[in-house]
Amino acid sequence: MKIRLENVNLNSNSGPNSFAQKIVREFQTLGHSFVNSGYDAALCFIEDHSNLSSKNLYQRLDGIYFNTDFNYDLQNSNILKTYQKAQGVIFQSKFSEELVTSFFGQHPNTTIIHNGANLDLIEKVQPIKNNVIDLYENVWSCAASWRPHKRLKENINYFLEHKGQNDCLMIAGKPDYFHKDPNIFYVGELNYEKLLSLYKRSKHFIHLGWLDNCPNVVVDARACGSQIICCSAGGTQEVAGADATVIEDSWDFKPTKLYNPPPLDFTKKIKNSYDSCYNMKKVTNKYLNFMTKNKF
C-alpha cells in the first residue's frame, strides 16, 4: 500500500512524531511505501495542513485543546475540519475518544488503537550502566517535555515518600522544577535509545501527568519492564499495565486551566482495570486493518 503522511516531522522526537517514527519503520518492514501523491491512504496526525481530499483520509487524533488560558476554539478549528472530513478517525485511548466526542460530537467511523513500542529494538538495548547509577539498588525514572501539567514536582514528591534507602530517581528532559536531593539526578535530554536504556534499568517509571492522552514514554517504559506509577485522569492508565500503581484523579471533560492541575493524594491508590497491547507490530496491523477495510 502507498501511504501519505500528513503533519509529520520524522526528525522530531515529540510524542506524535516519535510514534510516527515507530509506525513508519513497521510499515516499511511489511513492504508498504510512503509517497506524496498517488497514495492509497493518507494518515494525518492531528490536523491537515495540505487541504487533502476526504477520500481515504484517516486522522490519528490523540487529543484536542481545552486550556482556558488560550482560545481553544480557535486552536481546535482546523482539527475539527479534519475530523469532519476524515473517512476514519483513530483515537489513541478511550479517554481521547471521550474527550474529542464531548467537544466535537460523534464521528461515524472510529476506532481506538493504543500506542506501541518496538520490541525488537528494545530487546537489543542494554540497561544503562555508569559509576553513579551503579551505586544504587533500585532506579526510578521519569521523562517528559516538562510543563506544569506533567507534574514533575509531584513525581519527585512521590519518589521521596516511597523510595528505599538505596534508591535513586533519574529525571530526563528539560525540567521546569528543581529539588536538590542526593538521590535525585537530572540527566537532561536523552536520545531514544538512551531513554530505552534508562527504562530497562528502572524498577519504577513515574508519570503523574494530568490529562495525557496516551504518552509514548509510558508505553516504552512499560515495554522495557518498568512498573508504571500514574494517575487516573487521562489515558495514561490505559497503557500502564495491569500491575501499575494508579493514583485517583478526576476531570469532568469541561474546559479547564490545564497548567493548574489539582493536588494528588498519594494514599488514594486504585486497581488498574486496563491491560492494553503494546507490541508495535500488532499496533501497526490494527492501523492497516482500519485503513484498508472496505477498500482492498
Where are these regions (language model features)?
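Nucleotide-activated donor-binding/catalytic signature segment of Leloir-type glycosyltransferases, i.e.
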Residues: D176-L196
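Active-site proximal beta-strand in glycosyltransferases
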Residues: A41-D69
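Aromatic "clamp/platform" in nucleotide-sugar-dependent glycosyltransferases that forms part
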Residues: W210
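Short alpha-helical donor nucleotide-sugar binding micro-motif in glycosyltransferases
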Residues: Y83, S197-S202
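Carbohydrate-associated surface elements
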Residues: F95, G116
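Short hydrophobic beta-strand element within catalytic cores of glycosyltransferases
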Residues: Q227-C230, Q237
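Conserved donor-binding/catalytic core segment of Leloir-type glycosyltransferases
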Residues: K129-K150, I156-E161, L169-M170
